[in-house]
Amino acid sequence: MLSEDYPRIEYILIDGASTDGSTEIIRKYKDRFAYWVSEKDNGQAEAINKGLSRAKGEIVAWLNSDDYYLPNTISEVTNVFEENPDIVMVYGDILAVDEHGQTTNILKYKQLSLENLLCFQIIGQPSVFFRRAALEKAGLLDTSYHFLLDHHLWLRIAQQGKILHVPQIWSAARYHAEAKNRAKAAEFGREAFRILDWVKSQPGLMEAGSGVERRARASAHRVDARYLLDGGKSWSALKAWMRALFIHPPTALARMNIFVSAILNVVGLGKLRNIVLRRRQRIVSGNK
């Protein structure tokens, strides 16, 4: 991150009182930071909010410790905002890498609307950038969320104006066995349903979501199914996918891979699925 070519970057570093030597590294580069602190916090959202609340730049983003930007990303993002003064948020694509830095997948997104976000079309956080003015209107992260905290914020920012997808890879996100989105995968669904309940209390979102209510509910079950599958709870994932199918068939059928993977695991053929996935990862990373 410190090697980015764009000259006007405000670096804010929030460390949760790490004991792995991170503080010593931070002190080495402390002159590059507008602000830094190493202290205990009450979770990811609170830590990120500490940084967001101190940001002074017109464009704001955050990175978790496992993730990083690709070269020239900041310059490209700045140009997009300058060329599109009416947008409040922009997002690009993401490289998924393992703990060794090897590419395992390329996460390609599409142009989404507020209605798409209400139906849990998820945008990868590391490649998201937004205007500070929009953040000030939307508010900081809700600290009661731990898994879909970013999606909850995107919904609020998208109410402020246009969002734009740029089909370029801007960041890399590291996935490993200890990552939160795998270790506690079953919690994602609970927060998806919480967001649905929250939407009902937001007049502007209720109006935007009035035509997609069934699809949104089915999508929450689909999200639940996807992360239950990641968490190794295949039978629960299958039941969640079936609930999505009952509520809004097209939403469930668009993710038949969840159904197929869950079935393979339930009948004891999960190893076959894993072989296929490993082969796919080798192809993506260029290792035949």
What are these regions (language model features)?
Residues 151-152, 169-288:
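C-terminal subregions of glycosyltransferases and related glycan-biosynthesis enzymes
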Residues 1-8:
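Short, acidic, metal-binding catalytic loop of nucleotide-sugar glycosyltransferases
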Residues 53, 106-195:
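Conserved nucleotide-sugar donor-binding catalytic segment
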Residues 7, 15-24, 64:
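A conserved acidic beta->alpha catalytic loop
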Residues 25, 39-55, 76:
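Glycine-rich, basic loop-to-helix element that forms the pyrophosphate-binding segment
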Residues 60:
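Short aromatic/hydrophobic "clamp" motif used to bind/position activated sugar donors
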Residues 20-28, 68, 72:
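Acidic helix N-cap motif at the loop->helix transition within catalytic regions
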Residues 68, 72-104:
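Conserved donor NDP-sugar-binding/catalytic core segment of glycosyltransferases
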